[in-house]
Amino acid sequence: MDYINAALLGVIEGITEFLPISSTGHLIIAEQWLGHRSDMFNIVIQAGAILAVTIIYWRRLLDLVLGWREPANRDYAAKLIVAFLITAVLGLVVKKVLHFELPETATPIAWALIIGGFWMIFAEWAAARKAPHKEITWLVAILVGIAQIVAGIFPGTSRSGATIFVAMLAGTGNRAAATEFAFLVGIPTMYAASGYELLKTFKDGGAANEDWTALGIAFVVSTIVAFIAVKWLLAYIRSNRFTLFAVYRIILGVLLLGMAATGLIG
């Protein structure tokens, strides 16, 4: 993999990992033109995005750890842990028992983008008719944990999109509160998933022939771009709905279906 392709994939990962437009879907599509990427490369660029959001939320995370004696912090942290554990257990079942593999064609991704776009529009409509509560309930925590697995099974769904809008529909009508919980749950989830895949890759000898310069470039680019993207998103949702992302998903999904039908992509 050349360095320009590595940087481009880092940009794609950085932009799409935490925006509700599906990073996995975009990367699978990008692979059609930029070439196949190794498991190690996937792990590295995702690690960059995770690091970015960890830096953004480091004060909040530190507050939860140091302020665990406070009931509100303890309750919030417990819900994060429950959501993470649900994802971890279901993830192992999907991986080890069901032997799930990501699709390599664009058509299922296109449909997931389209369906997810309409789902986002509905979620915004439904949430607007509820009081904008900031509270994260136990129901929200459980459903967010499940939503992370659903997003992992269906690339194009978007982990952030699925978790944010499940939280909004389940009672957390405040966009900022739903987004924060979704991102905070994503931090341990993605670190655990990346760590698991990294150990597996080293064990299988998959890291032996990697271009570490390309990996380093992709990691740095992914971190910087993800930091900018998340900062922008958090500012954007203070006064805007997610409708822009929903429309983008639907348009992209339709375009991909057309390209797949005409043989432009696989």
Curated annotation (Swiss-Prot):
Any single GO BP term: peptidoglycan biosynthetic process
Reactions accelerated catalytically: di-trans,octa-cis-undecaprenyl diphosphate + H2O = di-trans,octa-cis-undecaprenyl phosphate + phosphate + H(+)
GO CC annotation: plasma membrane
GO molecular function: undecaprenyl-diphosphatase activity
Protein's cellular compartments: Cell inner membrane
Membrane topology classification: Multi-pass membrane protein
Protein name: Undecaprenyl-diphosphatase
Gene name of the record: uppP
